[in-house]
Each structure stands twice: as C-alpha cells, then as structure tokens.
Design a protein with these regions (language model features):
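Proline-centered loop/turn at the N-terminus of a beta-strand
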Residues: 27, 55, 93, 117-119
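NAD(P)-binding Rossmann-fold cofactor-contacting core
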Residues: 22-48
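N-terminal Rossmann NAD(P)H-binding glycine-rich loop of SDR-like oxidoreductase domains
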Residues: 6-18
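Conserved anion/nucleotide-ligand pocket segment
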Residues: 126
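Rossmann-fold NAD(P)-binding glycine/threonine-rich loop
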Residues: 83-88, 97-121
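Glycine-rich, highly charged phosphate/nucleotide-binding loops
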Residues: 48-64, 72-80
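Extreme N-terminal starter segment of soluble prokaryotic enzymes
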Residues: 1-4
Length: 126
C-alpha cells in the first residue's frame, strides 16, 4: 500500500517511517512537510534514513501526484482540517492521529467522514 504522511518530522512521523520501512506491504511515497528548503528536506531524508527517498513537499497537489492510497496525518488541528477538502476531491482515505481538536473541528471531520473513509484516532501513539 502506498502511504503518505503529514507530520514527518515529529516523533510519530519517525515511528511511522520505521514501521513502513520494516513491512514490505507498505511504501512511503510522499511526505508533507512545512519545509520549503530543498536543502533542509535533503537533510531530513538523510537523518531519517529514508530509502528509497519519498517525495517531500509542502504542496498538497504534489503529494497527491505521488498517488498515495492512504494519508496518515500527525500534524496540527488546523492543518488537518485543510486536508479534508482536497482529500475528499480525490477520495484519499485519512488516518488522523492529530490531537487537540475542538468539538466544532471534530464535527467538521465527522461530516467529511460521510463521504470519505476517515479513522480519527488521536493519541494512538500511547
């Protein structure tokens, strides 16, 4: 399964990368990063020992061009909400591990889940 991740530079991002690299059923095809510096992204790939190197991008349309089959999100509540509409447009299933949503934000995710497969599992790193 082709996987894309948001929040790649965080603790859970690192853990997910390790798990993906240890299981032949999964491949990391893209990662959404806030870094716009290609040099910093190159260092991130090297530091995380990403082999093969996935697409690192701050542009969601570029992430979608990598054709992921699922997007695992460990970002921030507002960033997660910004993923809903473009994910719905291409029917990209979401696994959301982000924490700190307000009740209103949870309702927005719930509405999106009526048309898009979404697993909302904050704190699943515990």
């Amino acid at each position: 399964m082709k996987v894309a991740i948001t929040g790649i530079s965080g603790r859970m991002g690192h853990t997910l990368i390790e798990a993906i690299q240890q299981d032949d059923r999964f491949s990391l095809v893209a990662a959404f990063t806030q870094e716009k510096s290609e040099e910093k992204n190159t260092r991130l790939v090297e530091n995380l020992n990403l082999t093969p190197s996935p697409l690192l991008t701050h542009d969601f349309s570029e992430l979608l061009a990598a054709n992921p089959e699922v997007l695992i999100d460990f970002s921030a509540p507002q960033a997660t909400l910004s993923l809903l509409a473009p994910s719905m447009q291409v029917s990209l299933p979401l696994i959301i591990g982000t924490t700190g949503f307000t009740e209103t934000q949870k309702l927005e995710i719930s509405k999106a889940s009526q048309t898009l497969p979404i697993v909302l599992a904050p704190n699943f790193s515990v």
